[in-house]
C-alpha cells in the first residue's frame, strides 16, 4: 500500500509556489501575480507527499491533521512546516480557507550558493518530521504569508526570506515536532494510490465498523502486503492507526 505522490509545478518566473483556497482545500488558486491566479485541483484532502517543502496556514476551519505517523486536531491559525517526502493529509470537518507555500531547493541549487542559507539545512532536515509553529513565531510568519498573494517580484522574494528567517531563529517552545520519525518514500511505486484510498476509507468509516477485508478489496493487496506497506508508509500498524482515530 503506497501513498500518492503529488507532482508540483512551480510557475514560470517564480522560485516557489503560493496556493490559496476558500471553502475547500480541494479547490485552490495558484497565485501567479497580484490579481492573477490559476484555478486548480488541490491535493491536501487525501494522503499524499511531494519532493517540495511546504508551509501551510489555516485561516479558518478545523479537523484532523495527519503528518507522517502523527494524528492530531487542528483549528484556525494552525501553521505547519512540512519537509520533503513527508506524507500528510488534512481532513477538514467543514468549510475552510488558508494558504500554502511550496518550494524545492535540492542539492546543487543556486539557493545554496549563498553561505547564509546553509543555516537552513538543519531546519529543512528537522522539517522532515513536520513542525507545528506557535507563539510569536507563528504570528510573524502568518502575517508574512498573508502578504504573499498581493506581492510580486523582489517584494515576494523578500517575504519568503523573512518567513525562513523567522522559522530558523524561532525559540524551541514555538516549534513542536509532529511525527516520531522522518520518511523517505520512493518516488514511484505500484502501490502509489492504495494508501490514499485506504486512509480515506478509514476516516470515513472509523466511527462504525471497519472491516479489514474491505480494505484489502479496496487496495487489491494481500493481507501480509497490506500490513507491511501500511506500517512502512504511515508509521503505524493498521490497528494502531485505527485506534488513534
Regions found by a protein language model. Give the residues of each.
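A hydrophobic/aromatic-rich effector-binding and dimerization subdomain
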Residues: 2-27, 84-147, 172-173
Amino acid at each position: 500500500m503506497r501513498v500518492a505522490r503529488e507532482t508540483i509545478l512551480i510557475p514560470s518566473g517564480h522560485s516557489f509556489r503560493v496556493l490559496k483556497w476558500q471553502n475547500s482545500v480541494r479547490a485552490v488558486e495558484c497565485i501567479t501575480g497580484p490579481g492573477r491566479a490559476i484555478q486548480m485541483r488541490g491535493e491536501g484532502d487525501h494522503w499524499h507527499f511531494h519532493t517540495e517543502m511546504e508551509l501551510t496556514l489555516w485561516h479558518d476551519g478545523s479537523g484532523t491533521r495527519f503528518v507522517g505517523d502523527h494524528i492530531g486536531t487542528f483549528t484556525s491559525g494552525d501553521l505547519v512546516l512540512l519537509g520533503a517526502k513527508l506524507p500528510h493529509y488534512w481532513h477538514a470537518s467543514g468549510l475552510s480557507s488558508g494558504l500554502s507555500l511550496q518550494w524545492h531547493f535540492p542539492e546543487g541549487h543556486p539557493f545554496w550558493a549563498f553561505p547564509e542559507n546553509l543555516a537552513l539545512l538543519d531546519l529543512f532536515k528537522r522539517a522532515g518530521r513536520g513542525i507545528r509553529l506557535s507563539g510569536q513565531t507563528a504570528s510573524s510568519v502568518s502575517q508574512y504569508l498573508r502578504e504573499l498573494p498581493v506581492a510580486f517580484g523582489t517584494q515576494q522574494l523578500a517575504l519568503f526570506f523573512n518567513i525562513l528567517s523567522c522559522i530558523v531563529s524561532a525559540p524551541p517552545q514555538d516549534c513542536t515536532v509532529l511525527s516520531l520519525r522522518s520518511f523517505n518514500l520512493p518516488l514511484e511505486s505500484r502501490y502509489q494510490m492504495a494508501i490514499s484510498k485506504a486512509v480515506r476509507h478509514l476516516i470515513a468509516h472509523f466511527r462504525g465498523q471497519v472491516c479489514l477485508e474491505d480494505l484489502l478489496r479496496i487496495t487489491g493487496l494481500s493481507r501480509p502486503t497490506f500490513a507491511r506497506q501500511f506500517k512502512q508508509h504511515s508509521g503505524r500498524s493498521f490497528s494502531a492507526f485505527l485506534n488513534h482515530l
